[in-house]
Swiss-Prot record:
GO terms for cellular component: mitochondrial matrix. Its main location: mitochondrion. Keywords: Mitochondrion, Transit peptide. It comes from the Eukaryota. This is Iron-sulfur cluster assembly factor IBA57 homolog, mitochondrial. One of its GO terms (biological process) is iron-sulfur cluster assembly. It comes from Aspergillus clavatus (strain ATCC 1007 / CBS 513.65 / DSM 816 / NCTC 3887 / NRRL 1 / QM 1276 / 107). GO terms for molecular function: transferase activity. InterPro entries: TrmE/GcvT_dom1, YgfZ/GcvT, YgfZ/GcvT_CS. Residues 1-21 form a transit peptide. Pfam families: Beta-barrel_CAF17_C (PF25455).
């Protein structure tokens, strides 16, 4: 079995949206293909056909988004409260503080079917293509009497790209996440974009009009380097950096933003005003401990060569590894029962992403209570045909799994995740935050055992 990518133009959740095979809450990986996924080049760009766009235009569009997303739509520390003119990573949450959609928000001068006046703000929201209709419903529910227009863009109207260049990955502390540099595109430009802050040196996000190759818009090699690669190569690169994307990996109404590293990725502004789902996110940041985070993992079998000891997983397109279904629990090898060590989210070949208990699967120490980590302990993902449902592989299987903490995430955690000045919170608030976290953990265990 050759390594395959689970990210295609149309995901299995879209294909099965009208099917009702089971009432169990199980999030599946997308249907694997038989294509061999090549290793990503050090320099290149990819057309992200798995992403969709929604335009939000009108005089109230900025205020509307400000109340719905985790990011600040205003320029930080600006006494005039100017509207930001740079793209940004963000998330939409439900009222319980769980992620509905991860997104990129881009300022646009005016898009088709847009603002009532040219001077009115206009925004593009980039989201998982399978989630465009769900997010549109969420936006319409909160629109009320706001003076704005919502529209899902058709295929071919605009194209989303990821572009990256060959350079050494910087350390998190040296990565200027707080900068509000001006956009590289003029306000009148039809092209939008931003730095992809989800990992240091990961590259840029670009949205171009039409479906032409990115080179048509950026002929200069200094602007966009390398050649175009397929979506699978981008996915491998993304997973090697520990970046989850879309609702097959950031599970809708289940994932928490800090567990998805959105704090490290500058996807959450902890100083802005109220927005939907803010309370738990802010309390966790200031008083709680994030015990689980999404990290890159290596899949291997007993007969396989040794896995890297530290650093990052190594992708090898020639390695044959069974592909676990998304949402499968991770457990210790040899353990009959016990607390789940994490959850496998998706993968390509012998690498992937998993939501892992850091003090169980890695050497990260979060509190003075001690850690359960033992470097000799191995972990596994086991599944049966019944677990996989209608879109998974037809056979049962088991594969070993090893978690890695990228250097920038390790440094961020070691720093205490302090990027903003924290306000003082009294003991009652701190206790309430801890109780909420324990309650969420218990709910997660109950869902898993149903």
């Amino acid at each position: 079995m050759r390594p395959t990518t689970s990210t295609q133009n149309i995901c299995a959740r879209c294909l099965n949206r009208g099917r009702h095979f089971s009432t169990n809450v199980q999030h599946r990986a997308q249907q694997p293909s038989n294509a061999i996924v090549s290793s990503p080049p050090q320099t290149g760009y990819a057309r992200l056909t798995n992403r969709g766009l929604i335009s939000i235009t009108g005089i109230d569009s900025t205020t509307f988004l400000q109340g719905l997303i985790t990011q600040n739509m205003l320029v930080a520390n600006d006494p005039n409260r100017a509207i930001r003119r740079t793209g940004t990573y963000a998330a939409f949450l439900n009222s319980q503080g769980r992620v509905l959609n991860d997104a990129f928000i881009y300022p646009m001068p005016r898009v088709d079917g847009g603002a009532a006046a040219p001077e009115d703000p206009a925004w593009l929201v980039e989201v998982d293509k399978c989630e465009v209709s769900s997010l549109m419903k969420h936006l319409k529910k909160h629109k009320l009497r706001s003076k704005l227009k919502l529209r899902a863009l058709e295929d071919g109207e605009r194209t989303v790209w990821s572009s990256w260049k060959d350079h050494t990955e910087p350390r998190w502390a040296a990565y200027n996440l707080e900068s509000e540099s001006s956009s590289q595109f003029s306000p009148s430009s039809p092209i939008a974009g931003c730095v992809d802050t989800r990992a240091p040196g990961f590259g840029s996000r670009i949205v171009t009009p039409g479906g032409e190759d990115l080179r048509m818009h950026f002929p200069d090699e200094a602007q966009v380097a390398g050649g175009e690669v397929d979506l699978g190569a981008y996915t491998v690169r993304r997973m090697l950096h520990g970046i989850a994307e879309g609702q097959s990996e950031i599970i809708r109404e289940s994932a928490l933003p800090l567990e998805c590293n959105m704090d490290m990725a500058r996807g959450v502004d902890f100083r802005k005003g109220c927005y939907v789902g803010q309370e738990l996110t802010i309390r966790t940041h200031h008083t709680g401990v994030v015990r689980k985070r999404i990290v890159p993992v290596q899949l291997y079998t007993g007969a396989q060569d040794t896995v890297p000891v530290d650093g990052l997983p190594a992708y090898d397109s020639s390695v044959e590894v069974p592909s676990p279904p998304s949402g499968t629990n991770i457990s210790k090898v040899g353990a009959r029962k016990g607390r789940s060590a994490g959850k496998f989210l998706g993968g390509v070949g012998n690498i992937g992403l998993a939501l892992c208990r850091l003090e169980m699967m890695t050497d990260i120490v979060l509190t003075s209570e001690g850690t359960q980590y033992n470097p000799e302990t191995e972990f596994k993902v086991s599944w049966t045909a019944a677990d996989e449902g209608p879109v998974g592989p037809s056979d049962s299987g088991e594969v070993k799994i090893k978690a890695f903490v990228p250097p920038w995430l390790r440094e961020y955690i070691a720093s205490g995740g302090v990027r903003n000045t924290a306000r003082k919170i009294d003991n009652e608030d701190a206790q309430r935050a801890r109780e909420l976290l324990y309650q969420l953990d218990e709910e997660e265990e109950l869902r898993r055992n149903e």
